[in-house]
A protein has these predicted regions:
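Structure-specific nucleic-acid interaction/processing domains
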Residues: 1-97
Length: 97
């Protein structure tokens, strides 16, 4: 099963990604440095994230899954640094600092 998922962090920010294997243990490849800046050492001692499956398919090609991932990133605005941790696709030429 191929899936598009959303990870929600304790601060409410999100990360949208794809998993072509539907691994229960896969939580994406968001930039750890971006996430670490948003949490103190104390907050990191007790840290929970939520993973939601937004879309799934047994028949979609890998390129269809990639297109669906971009669709969800744009719809949920997870590439807006105020909302999420996706760094791609870029929003209006913005670069994460």
């Amino acid at each position: 099963m191929k899936v598009i998922y959303k990870i929600t962090y304790p601060n409410g920010k999100i990360y949208v990604g794809k998993d072509l294997t539907d691994s229960i243990n896969y939580f994406g490849s968001a930039d750890s440095g971006l996430i670490e800046r948003d949490f103190s050492r104390e907050q990191r001692r007790d840290f929970s994230v939520r993973k939601e499956i937004l879309w799934e398919s047994e028949t979609a090609s890998d390129s269809e899954v990639s297109a669906k991932e971009v669709e969800f990133i744009r719809a949920l605005r997870s590439n807006d640094p105020k909302i999420g941790y996706n760094q791609w696709p870029r929003r209006n030429g913005e670069i994460y600092a």
